[in-house]
Amino acid sequence: MDAREKDKRAKAYEAGDVSWYEEEFLGLNFGDSRLDKRLGIIMNYRLKSPSGSIPDTFVTWAKTKAAYRFFSNDKVDPELIMKSHKNSTVSRLSGKQIILAIQDTTDISYSSHKDTEGLGYINDSETARGYHYHPTLAVTVEGTPLGILDSQVWVRE
């Protein structure tokens, strides 16, 4: 996204014409406006159902398939999405005297998905397969989440 487009989006946000996800992902550009738009649609659905699975969140098969197509598109880089979110998180830290950086490691189990590739052991069992996710969440002392500052994903061989 060039400087002119960033300025246009910033002015639209200031005028109240931009949804929350456009502010959150300001500057993110997949090189295809359809993908940029699809991210917004996906984020709005996820906002309404943050803990639901993709099929539960998107309800219809067509919407579910569109979400899966988005995530499998080679132009969609999860690192770029997270980088944009992390930048927005850092901007929300401004003016806060104390920020809590809360960390936790979670094991994501795919043990029932035998054909999934790229997984590792998540405990001492040879049958428990998945990956580890370690986010650092920025939170105010009042408990308001500001976003993810950092995240690490790894598999244990």
What are these regions (language model features)?
Residues 2-157:
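Conserved, well-structured functional cores that handle cations and Mg-NTP chemistry
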